[in-house]
Every structure is written in structure tokens, then in C-alpha cells.
């Protein structure tokens, strides 16, 4: 079992005066920019809940202390008709040869279903100060047979000369109706490999799926290797509208075994105000793990 000591909320939209960040802040991606700055790339949503990607800089030794933030998006929505014209959402970061790659999910509104989501990729050449899209017209992960509406939230690792990707995509059922009467997507966790960072096969392998009929979403989260195994903390969505964090392990990275009692979150201390402590009472989602010096943090949305 992995024990985590909760430290409370770092920020929300009310902490800033940004016209494009007035609602949800989600999918935090921490990045060690320097010894003095831990940059958290995050999706910042406007009144219509359309996401754009910005950042909040915090103290690496005390992430609750905010040092600065982006006054404009570092990654904006695409032009009308593009795969990301109705929102861009952070997915993961990958560094190689002095370049910082940002993988993201692009949203497009639809008529008969609420949306489609496909993955894009962008790159920063200046240590995360600016980001340029590499996929403007065609997504990195476009639709394929069996995964026609959702191929998003990719995470990449390079091992033994091979790129490995875990991502979220349609399961066999595509869409369902939740307890709230709204259409909800069925999706689980996929895996594939490639010899090239910007080119991926049009087939995948299901790495982790549902445990019961009440679940409809297995969202990619944070993955690391330790003790000869892959460890995964993911987001689990259920038809009653809730989201929580789950845990799974794998020997080969292709087939994960869920360990639903593998996470323990200890409550925040008395030094944290109720406002900062209670932000996650309804749900916990979108985890990202990072070790800074001798401390290991789990950033997430509540």
C-alpha cells in the first residue's frame, strides 16, 4: 500500500484574475524548471468550460507557495474545424535531446454525442517558457477502427530503444447514459509501441479495463517503474458521476493488475484551512507523480 499525506489545495481560478481561467483547473503536470521553480502546467477553463493550457510556478520545497503564473495561454485552442477547436487539455510531458514535449488532448464538439477527443503533441525549445504545436491539422492519435471517438491522454516512455505509449481510448461500448441522464463515454487504458516519437501504429492492446458494470472510464494517470514493476495511479469514473484514484501494477507494462486498496490518503493537518482542505471531498482525479529532492509528490485535481 502507498500512503500519501494530503497537503491541501494549491490554487483555483479564484486565486487569479484571468478572463480565460474562471472555472475548472485540471490535469496538473509538474515540471522542474530550475532549483528555484517548480512549474505546474495545467488546463485552465473559461466560463464555457473550454480549456487552454497555462502554468503556475511554485516553490519546489513548498509547492503550496505560489511564485507566479502565466498571464496568457502557453497552448491555445485550434482554429475552427480543427481537432482541438473546443479545448486543449494537458496530458503528459516527455523530455528528449533538450526538448520538452507536451502531449495534450484536443476537444471537438459534436451533435449526436457531446464531443470527440484526439491527442496532439507540442514542443518547447526554451525550457517550458513557450510551446509550439507540432500537430495543427491532424492529431498525433487520429481515429481508427474500434477507437473512433476517443484517443487521448497519452503518456510516453522510452525504454531499450523503443517508445512506449499508454493512452485512453474507446472501449467496445463507446457511449452510455449515466445516472444523471447524460451521455458518458466508455473508455479504458491502451498500450502500444513505436520506433518513432511522432508516428504510432493504428492498433493497440488493452492494458487495463473495468472491474464491474458500474464503471465507464479508466483514465490514464501517472506511471513509473520501481522494484521491477510498472506502477500506475489512474482515474476511475463510475456511472454515478464520481471519480476517484485507482492503483495497478504490471510486470511488462502491457497487462496491469488492479489493486483497489493500494492507496491510502491521510487527511490534511490542522494547519490547512477548511477551504484548502475540502476541495476534493467529491472527487479526486488526474494524478501526476513527481519526486523533488527527497520528497515525492502526487499532484491531482479535486
Predicted regions and their residues:
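Beta-rich carbohydrate-recognition and catalytic domains
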Residues: 1-27, 31-86, 94-153, 157-216, ...
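Charged, gly/pro-rich active-site loop segments
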Residues: 91
